UniProtKB/Swiss-Prot annotation:
Job of this protein: Catalyzes the attachment of serine to tRNA(Ser). Is also able to aminoacylate tRNA(Sec) with serine, to form the misacylated tRNA L-seryl-tRNA(Sec), which will be further converted into selenocysteinyl-tRNA(Sec).
Name of the molecule in the record: Serine--tRNA ligase
Enzyme class: ligase
EC number assigned by the record: 6.1.1.11
Chief location: cytoplasm
Keywords, sorted A to Z: Aminoacyl-tRNA synthetase, ATP-binding, Cytoplasm, Ligase, Nucleotide-binding, Protein biosynthesis
One GO location term (cellular component): cytoplasm
Amino acid sequence: MLDLKNLQNNFDEVAKKLKNKKVDENILKKLAELFASLKKEKIALEEFQAFQNKFSKELATAEDKESLKAKLSENKSKINEQSAKVNALENELEEIAHAIPNIPDECVPVGEDENENVELKKVLNPPSFDFTPKEHFELGESLNWLDFIRGVKISQSRFCVLKNEGALLSRALVNYMIDFNRSRGFEFVNVPFLVNGATMFGTGQLPKFKEDMYKVDDEDLYLISTSEIPVTNLYSGEILASETLPIKMTCYSACFRKEAGSAGRDTRGIIRQHQFEKVELVSITKTEQSDSVFNEMLECASDLLSSLGLAHRHLMLCTGDLGFSAAKTVDLEVWLPGQNKYREISSVSNCRDFQARRAKIRYKNEQGKNELVHTLNGSSLAVGRTLVAIMENYQDKEGKIHIPDVLKKYF
């Protein structure tokens, strides 16, 4: 959640940044009106409170005590009424603020959508083929690695069954990713895939994205869309010791997304599924640590792709493509020769103190004061898309898939 005090004190500047992130102008106008009303009602409340304080002290020496008591009683009722007005405005303001995204960093390019994201660099050269490379779903069906028909039969569309060497390769990737991330100093944690509403709120999924979540009927439980959600919230409501930071974690999980806005996109294959697997990086840092830890996380995910021999590029997301909780995001896109283009395989984001304010994660700084932490997250990597990338990049003209050397010991 945004710092409401900063929003109120620097409204025009913050509102301009939020417009770049596609926040509705009517919502910003409503916020401005609420801030003005709240200021007015707080002044009135302070006047009533000042009257109460002043004349309460004079009551003992007043000549007409009964008259003053009556005035103080009447004023106390006004204080209660005015406090209720202020509380109602603060609650309305906070409710609207819950659906307002994070402010983009100064380095984030202003743009409308993914077409205005900025390429930062390319890593490795895409492979060349003396034949027309196939897409992963063609390879997967011919090798009996991917069973879409039975996936749909037991579930619905956008579900797939992995079989034979395809399932083994997926498992090998998970183990390799966890080991690689641990070698870079990230502690492995294993968390529940079902979390409560407060946890979903803490990382920004609720209330704005409620319709995109899978919820258990009659229970306050949601299936996670990313392990960022439970891992970040491991420390919700806590005050951490300064010397314990940064906390750097990696986690494997299944992820569940309705993909409501993706009708007609990636309808073939396993690029976009309702259930998929991901190995995540999550870090909790002091303010001054978050930029360097962001670079560490980005380097970890990029080096992991390089270790698999997969050509990829770094993209800085523009304001219009930036996620709800993120202040800055760099996407990694892997080269898929079957599609003849780069596709997203990782997003590394710095959320600054936005999630920490919602989840109430703080640390005691060197001056002994409680300060909000910064939270960061990133995929290292999306398992299914890495499987896709290996299938397409390591295929031969006979339709066989060669396994990267670093994975062979995991079979």
